[in-house]
Structures are given as C-alpha cells and as structure tokens.
Design a protein with these regions (language model features):
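Long, low-complexity intrinsically disordered regions
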Residues: 1-285
C-alpha cells in the first residue's frame, strides 16, 4: 500500500505564515478575520489541525496544532471563533454558506465567481435540479427576500425540520441562498436571503468551468505552497479529477511544478519556499 506523502518542514512553515498559524498573527476581530479570508481566498470556519487548509478557528488559535475541544462553550478560542463567525455573517463583506459536500466555508468576494461556476446553477435549471422542498423555500424567499427560519418553514409549507434543513442546504450548496444573521434570543434562528442580493456582481459574472478549476487551484496553492494527493479535494469539496485538472492547468502555464503523481508545488518565481531543482525533497527528480 502506497504511503501518503508528507508535507516538508519548509512548506509547513510557509503555511504557518500564510494561514496565520503563528501566535504573532492571530485573528482577534471581525476585521482581522475578513482580511484573513481575503488573503487566503477561502477558508473553513471551525475545522482544526486534523483537517487540511486555512481555517478561521486555527487562525484564532494562532498555532499549527490547534484541536477543537469537546466542550466548545467553555473554551475561549472556540467561543471567539464562533462569535467572529456570527459577526462576519452580519457584516456581509465575505460570502458564508454550506457549500459543496456540506463544507461550511468563507469565500473572499474575488473567489465567488469561480466557486459559483462549479456549484451554482442557472435559474432555468432549478426545476430540474432542485427538490420540491428547496423550490418551495426559494419561491418564498424570492417573494419576501429575507426571512427567519421559523417563518420560512411556515410560509413554504416545509414544516418538517429535517426536510427544511435539507432544502436550505440544497439552496446553499447551489449558491442561491445565504444566511445574513443568527439570533440566539428569544430562540435560536437564522435569517435567510438570496445570495445575489449581497453579492450581485460576483454571482452574475460568468466564467468557464475550466477557468474556475484553475483559479481555485491557484488560490489554494498560493497559500499551501504545495499540495499532496487528495488534499485540495478535501479542502474545497471538488471531486479529485477536477482538482487534478485545476492543478495541471497551473503546471501548463508555469505557475506550478508537478513533482510526483498528485503532488504539485509553486514554482520559485511564484513564491515557492523551495525550488524543486534546488532541494533535496523526496519529490525532486
């Protein structure tokens, strides 16, 4: 059985700087968080060191080995990450939703067109691709524009909690609906709206799927320095063949070098911490 390639130490140090896994560059405010998301392009919300990729929670902790505790309510770092998430959603300067494969992510505005090209759908496709419950929820939101979870369940007629959640998740994954606020009193509820209301230009911009795959790969590799087999797919939710197509497009333009099957690294002129031709990396030829 083939072993999983290891990330070299110099690449981990590169990621420490890019993904704010350093105590001197911790995220402490919503403004810090928005700058972090803009710099990395996209980030998970509450993943820890056990999952690859940039993460708001890890950036709040400011260390590479951050692990989410079981009791998040009593943990200062987990609580701060949760509070920042809610504030970022209210501010509406970056995109936040549960996207492909159920991954809850933040997107910088510049990355929205590329993710939408992969996961979005045209209005003409909605009746064919969306479930009846998702269509019922969407019909209400297009009429009312913004509504709380409980009111939306009543108005749409999708009163079963699990069925409603699945419908909203469908709409989030298709980049049609986003949360705009969350309230905990007098009862817990999200406020939902159409994504195009918050990010009209980004969601209406048309790009090809091939361009989208290349730019998502570029964004990840710029922050990661190197990617190993399956890593980008795990972070972004892309199928592995699509992740590979994006990475190979970067090789074709000289932005990245392919060191082994599924292993790609930034070239030296694009900021790589090590150049394949000058390193004793096990991936170098």
């Amino acid at each position: 059985m083939r072993s999983t390639p290891q990330i070299p130490a110099e690449i981990e140090e590169y990621r420490d700087e890019r993904w704010r896994r350093e105590a001197t560059r911790q995220v402490e405010t919503a403004f810090d968080a928005e700058r972090f998301i803009e710099q990395v392009g996209f980030a998970a919300c509450l993943t820890d060191s056990r999952r690859p990729g940039p993460s708001l929670y890890v950036a709040v902790c400011g260390r590479r080995d951050a692990v989410m505790p079981r009791n998040v309510q009593k943990d200062r770092e987990a609580s701060l990450a949760w509070v920042l998430k809610d504030e970022i959603v209210r501010r509406g300067k970056v995109y936040y939703a549960k996207l492909g494969r159920g991954k809850t992510m933040f997107l910088a505005p510049r990355m929205i067109p590329y993710f939408h090209a992969v996961w979005g759908m045209r209005r003409s496709e909605e009746k064919r691709r969306l479930s009846r419950n998702a269509q019922a929820i969407l019909k209400v939101l297009r009429r009312e524009w913004e509504m709380s979870t409980s009111d939306l369940r009543d108005e749409s007629g999708v009163k079963d909690r699990q069925a409603f959640t699945r419908g909203v998740d469908e709409l989030q994954a298709a980049m049609i609906v986003v949360p705009t606020a969350v309230y905990y009193q007098p009862k817990f509820t999200y406020i939902w709206t159409l994504g195009v209301g918050r990010f009209p230009d980004a969601l209406r911009r048309r790009v090809s799927r091939e361009t989208a795959l290349r730019e998502i790969a570029r964004c990840f590799l710029a922050g990661a320095g190197m990617t190993i087999p399956g890593e980008m797919a795990r972070v972004t939710g892309l199928p592995r063949p699509d992740a590979g197509r994006g990475n190979r497009a970067l090789v074709a333009e000289g932005y990245a070098a392919m060191l082994a099957t599924g292993v790609y690294q930034l070239t030296a002129r694009h900021g790589s911490p090590t150049c394949p031709a000058d390193t004793d990396s096990p991936y170098a030829e």
